[in-house]
C-alpha cells in the first residue's frame, strides 16, 4: 500500500482552526456514495487522491457511453422536459436552474440538481405529477434490477426529502430484455420497463442511508487519514474498484486471493493470522482439496498435470476440429429481430489439428 503525507491531505481541506466541518470535506455524490458502500478506503481515495485511480478500461468507457445513450432515449418519453445542462462542478447554477424549472412547472426535469447534508445528487428524471409531488426515475442501461439500484435511488430520496421535495413514487427505468426490434423508430414504451421501488427505497433512505452517510462523513472528517481496509471481495463486488491496482500492487507473489473459491470466512482467518502469501499457509490449515492442490504447486514451483487429462487426450480421434467464432452485442438493438444485449455472431474460423501436429486453418 502506498503511503501519503498527512500534511498534504490536511492542508487541502482543513479550516483555519484545523478542525474539519462539513464545509471543509469533499461533497458526496451518487457515485461516491456507492463507492463508500463498497469500501471506505476507496471513498477516501476518490475524494482525496483521485489521481491514484486506475485508467478506465475499454469496457468501463463503453458502459458509460451506453448509459448516456440510454438516458437520452429515456428523455424522449417525457416531452417538454427541461435539461439541467450545467457542468457537475457548477452546482450553484445547476441548483438555481432546477428551481427555475420547478417554478415554471416543467413536466419533467432531467439531471435535476439538489444538495442536502453535504450530498449533491443529480436525478436522471424528476417527473412532475401536477399536485405538488414528483416521481423520481433512475435510468439504467441494464436489463434487471440490482441491489445497488435501490441504494442509488435511496440516497437521492434522502437528499430530495431533506431539500423539501415531496416524492410520491420512485422507479427504476431499465431496458426490457424481451423487447424485439422490428425496424424503424424504437417503441420506447416497449423498450423500457419501470420497476416500482418506492417502498423499499424510501425505507432504506430513512434508515440505512442516514447511518451510511454518517459513517462516510466520519471517514472524510478524520483529518484526511487513510482508513485501514483489508483486501477482499469488496475489491471486485459489486464493481471492480477504481483503485484496485493501488491496493494490490504490493501483494506478494501468489497471494491468497489466487486460491480457488476463497470464502469470506477463510479470507478473514488468513488475514487475522497475517498470512498474505499462499506459500505461508501451513499444512493442515483446513483448505479444500482444490485449494490444497494450489498450495502444493506453489510450494513445489512445479507444473502438475492431472493424469486423467492425459488419458482423455489420448482417447481423442484425429483430426481435431476447433471452432472459433466472434459475436457482437448492442445495448439498444440495431438489427431487426434482435433484443437488447443479444449476442450476434458475425465471424467464425475453423482450426484443424492433425495427428502429426500440423494445423490447418
Positions of predicted regions on the chain:
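Metal-dependent nuclease catalytic cores in nucleic-acid-processing enzymes
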Residues: 147-171, 349-354
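Flexible loop/turn segments at secondary-structure boundaries
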Residues: 52, 144-145, 179-180, 250, ...
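A charged, amphipathic alpha-helical module
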Residues: 209-317, 327
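Metal-dependent nuclease catalytic regions and adjoining charged, substrate-binding loops involved
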Residues: 14, 144-147, 162-243, 360
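Conserved RNase H-like, two-metal-ion catalytic cores of nucleic-acid enzymes
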Residues: 114, 308-361
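Short secondary-structure boundary/capping segments
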Residues: 53, 185-190, 336-343
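Metal-dependent nuclease catalytic cores that hydrolyze phosphodiester bonds in DNA/RNA
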Residues: 2-133, 264-305
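Active-site ExK catalytic segment of metal-dependent nucleases
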Residues: 111-113, 122-128, 133-145, 152, ...
Amino acid at each position: 500500500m502506498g503511503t501519503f503525507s498527512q500534511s498534504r491531505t490536511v492542508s487541502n481541506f482543513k479550516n483555519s482552526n484545523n478542525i474539519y466541518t462539513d464545509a471543509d470535506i469533499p461533497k458526496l455524490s451518487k457515485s461516491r456514495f456507492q463507492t463508500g458502500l463498497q469500501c471506505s478506503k476507496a471513498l477516501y481515495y476518490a475524494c482525496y487522491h483521485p489521481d491514484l485511480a486506475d485508467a478506465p478500461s475499454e469496457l468501463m468507457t463503453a458502459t458509460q457511453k451506453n448509459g448516456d445513450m440510454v438516458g437520452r432515449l429515456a428523455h424522449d418519453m417525457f416531452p417538454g422536459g427541461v435539461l439541467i445542462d450545467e457542468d457537475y462542478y457548477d452546482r450553484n447554477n445547476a441548483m438555481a436552474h432546477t428551481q427555475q424549472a420547478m417554478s415554471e412547472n416543467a413536466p419533467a426535469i432531467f439531471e435535476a440538481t439538489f444538495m442536502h447534508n453535504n450530498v449533491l445528487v443529480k436525478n436522471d428524471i424528476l417527473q412532475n405529477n401536477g399536485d405538488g409531488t414528483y416521481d423520481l426515475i433512475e435510468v439504467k442501461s441494464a436489463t434487471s434490477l440490482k441491489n445497488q439500484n435501490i441504494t442509488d435511488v435511496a440516497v437521492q430520496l434522502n437528499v430530495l426529502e431533506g431539500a423539501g421535495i415531496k416524492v410520491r413514487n420512485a422507479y427504476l427505468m431499465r431496458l426490457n430484455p424481451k423487447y424485439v426490434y422490428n425496424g424503424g423508430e424504437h417503441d420506447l414504451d416497449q423498450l423500457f420497463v419501470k420497476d416500482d421501488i418506492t417502498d423499499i427505497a424510501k425505507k432504506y433512505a430513512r434508515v440505512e442511508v442516514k447511518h451510511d452517510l454518517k459513517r462516510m462523513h466520519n471517514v472524510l472528517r478524520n483529518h484526511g487519514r487513510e482508513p485501514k481496509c483489508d483486501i477482499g471481495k469488496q475489491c471486485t463486488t459489486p464493481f471492480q474498484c477504481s483503485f484496485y491496482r493501488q491496493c494490490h500492487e504490493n501483494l506478494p507473489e501468489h497471494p491468497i486471493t489466487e486460491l480457488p473459491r476463497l470464502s469470506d470466512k477463510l479470507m478473514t482467518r488468513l488475514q487475522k493470522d497475517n498470512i498474505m502469501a499462499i506459500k505461508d499457509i501451513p499444512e493442515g490449515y483446513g483448505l479444500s482439496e482444490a485449494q490444497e492442490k494450489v498450495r502444493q504447486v506453489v510450494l513445489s514451483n512445479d507444473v502438475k498435470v492431472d493424469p486423467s487429462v492425459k488419458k482423455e487426450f489420448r482417447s481423442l480421434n484425429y483430426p481435431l476440429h476447433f471452432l472459433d467464432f466472434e459475436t457482437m452485442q448492442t445495448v439498444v438493438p440495431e438489427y431487426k429481430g434482435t433484443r437488447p444485449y443479444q449476442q450476434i455472431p458475425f465471424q467464425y474460423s475453423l482450426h484443424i489439428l492433425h495427428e502429426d501436429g500440423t494445423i490447418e486453418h
